[in-house]
């Protein structure tokens, strides 16, 4: 595969992931991740296999940095990894992610831990907004 073909494939996969996320995840959830930018590229996943991916720059309550969603075409599933703002991977790759669970998984990694009640989330969001307001003064 030529360099141009690889770039085209990476963009195609990134657009596919974005479409699947927007089709399966509430827009308010997507907005809560504080996506500041996105891109397409290639990354070596948990098995060392090079895969096309979507790269999101996020600023959520739980994670600020990069989220990489890579398509494992051989298994037809996604692999997800988090990176801090310095570019260091945070934790292990999460594999075997299907498209129907991708949005909720990303939300639990970026913005809202699994099991958190709506009331706790609202309180945490309000506190985070208050702190950000203080820091801007």
Model-based region annotation:
Residues 54, 68-71, 77:
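Eukaryotic intrinsically disordered, low-complexity regulatory linkers and tails enriched in Ser/Thr/Pro
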Residues 63-67:
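Short, surface-exposed coil-to-beta transition loops
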Residues 74-87:
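Short, surface-exposed beta-strand/strand-loop-strand elements in extracellular ectodomains
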């Amino acid at each position: 595969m030529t360099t141009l073909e690889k770039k085209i494939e990476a963009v195609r996969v990134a657009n596919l992931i974005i479409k699947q996320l927007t089709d399966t995840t509430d827009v308010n959830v997507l907005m809560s991740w504080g996506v500041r930018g996105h891109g397409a590229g290639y990354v070596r996943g948990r098995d060392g296999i090079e895969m096309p991916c979507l790269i999101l720059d996020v600023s959520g309550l739980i994670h600020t940095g990069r989220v990489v969603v890579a398509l494992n075409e051989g298994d037809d599933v996604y692999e997800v990894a988090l990176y801090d703002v310095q570019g260091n991977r945070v934790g292990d790759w999460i594999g075997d992610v299907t498209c129907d669970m991708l949005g909720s998984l990303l939300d639990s990694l970026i913005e809202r831990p699994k099991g958190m009640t709506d009331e706790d989330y609202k309180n945490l969001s309000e506190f985070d907004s208050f702190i950000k307001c203080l820091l801007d003064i």
